[in-house]
From Swiss-Prot:
This is H(+)/Cl(-) exchange transporter 5. Ubiquitinated by NEDD4L in the presence of albumin; which promotes endocytosis and proteasomal degradation. GO terms for molecular function: antiporter activity; ATP binding; voltage-gated chloride channel activity. InterPro entries: CBS_dom, CBS_dom_sf, Cl-channel_core, Cl_channel-5, ClC.
Amino acid sequence: MAMWQGAMDNRGFQRGSFSSFQNSSSDEDLMDIPATAMDFSMRDDVPPLDREVGEDKSYNGGGIGSSNRIMDFLEEPIPGVGTYDDFNTIDWVREKSRDRDRHREITNKSKESTWALIHSVSDAFSGWLLMLLIGLLSGSLAGLIDISAHWMTDLKEGICTGGFWFNHEHCCWNSEHVTFEERDKCPEWNSWSQLIISTDEGAFAYIVNYFMYVLWALLFAFLAVSLVKVFAPYACGSGIPEIKTILSGFIIRGYLGKWTLVIKTITLVLAVSSGLSLGKEGPLVHVACCCGNILCHCFNKYRKNEAKRREVLSAAAAAGVSVAFGAPIGGVLFSLEEVSYYFPLKTLWRSFFAALVAAFTLRSINPFGNSRLVLFYVEFHTPWHLFELVPFILLGIFGGLWGALFIRTNIAWCRKRKTTQLGKYPVIEVLVVTAITAILAFPNEYTRMSTSELISELFNDCGLLDSSKLCDYENRFNTSKGGELPDRPAGVGVYSAMWQLALTLILKIVITIFTFGMKIPSGLFIPSMAVGAIAGRLLGVGMEQLAYYHQEWTVFNSWCSQGADCITPGLYAMVGAAACLGGVTRMTVSLVVIMFELTGGLEYIVPLMAAAMTSKWVADALGREGIYDAHIRLNGYPFLEAKEEFAHKTLAMDVMKPRRNDPLLTVLTQDSMTVEDVETIISETTYSGFPVVVSRESQRLVGFVLRRDLIISIENARKKQDGVVSTSIIYFTEHSPPLPPYTPPTLKLRNILDLSPFTVTDLTPMEIVVDIFRKLGLRQCLVTHNGRLLGIITKKDVLKHIAQMANQDPDSILFN
């Protein structure tokens, strides 16, 4: 089968000669039919087809008609036919069929010549080469983002006089005047007060540093939101809800384009550096998918087939998580569990390869200078005990409650943003939230530091030489066996840190609600993990002190002896981080694997599993949707969730259009309509496709034709053949209809007709129809009764019906 020109290259074909085509109709409005009264008492003995296809003829068409005046312009591919308009859903069945035909043709030709064999081998290898390129580009961009964000975050507090391109840590690495206890202080690093007023002491110096911190934060946020607004509006947010929708078959032109990639990369650095409560991990998935989409254009196999391209995007999403967390296996599982709609075994292998290459590339760049892929990598050595499952489950309950609370409040705020004047002033909103965040963050060292550094500090297992306030314990021992420190009483620094962390927790919980969803790149992974890590560290320190002061208690004396290292507060922080992230996203398997890859400890999988499952159960009890599904519904994307069961006893006839007493279904006949008739129907309707029937009287179904293919084919015929006029007959049969002499040439369009559209009877239960739409990725399904066409069910009709059954607003299923 000939392959059509790739969808991404055909913006020009949106400019048809018909106004309705210029308006770029959505196939989700496919048959908002001005519908018809249905006569369900129609006779069963419908007369046979007017013209049966000859037994010795090919049913798929493409043959030459008997009349020498027949114009069949589809012997050669017409650019644009078989492609899709913006905000349309792809036809998964047709795309997979076209790829099988292409593969069959290449395989057959490979037996004919050496050159064809080489072409066959290169075609098979192209997928792996594409994965290699995606991994290299994603890893390189992630390294660039990490290094730039680290430097710009430190720029808010000062600058390195030994080289302005060094961040604080790198600046002091080569200094000869730094001590181990104060390794973050060196003469080469100057705060803004030292540069401006030559001193770092006193109230005025504090005010200068405070002012510069807020000023830099506002500047970075202003640049980020301005670049997004002017150059790439699609670069805002995390991108994961939209990527889920795109992977389900929806087309959003430009969302994964070159400008989006460039602006998202730049503004992600600016947004993270501004100190807002957001992360770069979610947007890195969007960046990786942009890389995958752009590189697809180098390979015809993927450029010209939307279904194959979505397999590549699934692998790119895995590479994005791989570089975000340094977790290649977790990335593959994230793509499978959270974002992918269609995930065949071949995609699993290629996703693994892309994630591996991306992680290796980032490791080679070594952005943090510690040979790790993430800033908060940590290793624990103390085993956990069975009793600790109780506080771990408590952290899971907290994570579920936080997740449900966050989703409800964030969605309410985002809905307010969409429905009020607030949404018209994205720059002001970003600047106000940034100013509030910066003003409240600077006085507290735990909110002033970047969120990744905060998580690293909370995960840290205190050693004897740690200078952090969280490790300010009273050392009441002489020796330390095996390098492990026993549980110790908390010092002044620990109590001070607890109060500061409690305030940090409150700020993070509140400010993240208003930050996620603003018109800047904003991920949710890191803020959610920070909330959980703070709660976990607070609980961990509490358990540690309880075990130290009350070792005689029954729950402790069986396993925690005097002078032993019983409780690891950093482990509680890690479990809390997993619980809160699971509560917000509802991830389970991939979340546990990502956290396991972060810590490198197999023995902590059980605590992580207990917390992740508890948080999911608690959050699901309070609301079924994760944050990404909630944003998909808020934006009205046509996404059919595969995880939800449809348990209602409705039938196809209850959902199809037209309903009883509605106008008749708009159809085309197979051989009796003129070009003018078809153009009139196209100009007067906005449907994205039309059923083709034998005749209006019989309503016997022949096939289904897409609006876009009709328009392009008719326009192409008018340009290339002088004989085609408005009175030319259009026919979809194998042979030309008998015509009187001196009639204008006919136009054969059988090759754009889908001869095997999916059909169900009017009495088919809707649970089966919903299952068909989910598993086959259909755009529409025709409804028949005894072989006669009754109506049509589109994907949007299914979504509206599901919303109606769930007592939600069915009109919210629109692309907003």
